[in-house]
Amino acid sequence: MTSKLDQLREITTVVADTGDIEAVARLKPVDCTTNPSIVLKALGTPMFADAIKEAVAWGKTQGGNPEAVSSAVADRLAISVGAALVKLVPGRVSTEVDADLSFDTEASLAKARSIIAAYKDRGIERDRILIKLASTWEGIRAAEVLQKEGIDCNLTLLFSKAQAIACADAKVFLISPFVGRILDWYKKSTGKDYTAEEDPGVISVRDIYNYYKANDIKTIVMGASFRNAGEIEALAGCDRLTISPALLDELAKDEGKLERKLSPESRKPDAKVSVDEKTFRWMMNEDAMATEKLAEGIRAFAKDLTTLRTMVQKELQLAAA
């Protein structure tokens, strides 16, 4: 009998949400996604000890204030993790723009371009990379510009249809609507448990997927942030799903039948709309869950980025002693 993971691969592009080199080599996903939390975890493994030494040695040769140097070294380390993953997957690796730039379009553009240039310096072309940006109004505007420059983007921390519509308007390459974090919010808010079919995160991604397919929107829908295998199974057939190694392993061990839940052919009419800035901000204001989870996600990624920069500062100080 074929595993559910293999059945899923027949209808959905499977992406690994990890920086764990061994897991990626074993599970053989098409793409990989990273974020500051994943980069920080990867750098804590022996596999990246040499990369840390190299980045710190490079940092010692850089001028400028200590904060700028530590930020540049942190960027270099994130690229090191991404470059290692690129060697293991046939597709793309997502690298995230600093979370503390989520409300600054111009700074996000500068950072994204520098990430692409850093990969280029390592012989990795832009067609192997996705630039991850938070789905704020400013992040979406940055993505719109980058897409016109031939830099494909992955819009993350997406919790609402308003964000998905704005991303479609901007013609971004890919969106990552979250599932598990939406479920977390509703469970905390209502005190209820939800089956996979009732799961508000699953329902949200299905609605976005249907809207895109109903209107022939080319942006790829990649479900993200899963709490259990049931959520993944409930979105079988989605364009892509980015999944943690633990849940990939669980699906690989399950030889039950996987039913396709999503397909372009099953789309239902859903009139196409566009959103300007004031409409976007109002729709987000009216969606307490999306507003809270977006802000929470940005804070969490910014915290991990600060932790990484602090680690780098300590390494630089030790190297200078």
Curated annotation (Swiss-Prot):
Localization: Cytoplasm
Superkingdom in the source lineage: Bacteria
The keyword Metal-binding is annotated on this UniProt entry: no
Example of a GO cellular component annotation carried by this entry: cytosol
Family designation: Belongs to the transaldolase family. Type 1 subfamily.
Catalytic activity: D-sedoheptulose 7-phosphate + D-glyceraldehyde 3-phosphate = D-erythrose 4-phosphate + beta-D-fructose 6-phosphate
Record-level GO BP terms: carbohydrate metabolic process; pentose-phosphate shunt
InterPro entries per record: Aldolase_TIM, TAL/FSA, Transaldolase_1, Transaldolase_AS
Name recorded for this polypeptide: Transaldolase
Pathway: Carbohydrate degradation; pentose phosphate pathway; D-glyceraldehyde 3-phosphate and beta-D-fructose 6-phosphate from D-ribose 5-phosphate and D-xylulose 5-phosphate (non-oxidative stage): step 2/3
Organism annotation: Rhizobium etli (strain CIAT 652)
Entry function: Transaldolase is important for the balance of metabolites in the pentose-phosphate pathway.
NCBIfam families named in the record: PRK12346.1, talAB
Subunit structure: Homodimer.
Cross-referenced SUPFAM superfamilies: Aldolase
Keywords: Cytoplasm, Pentose shunt, Schiff base, Transferase
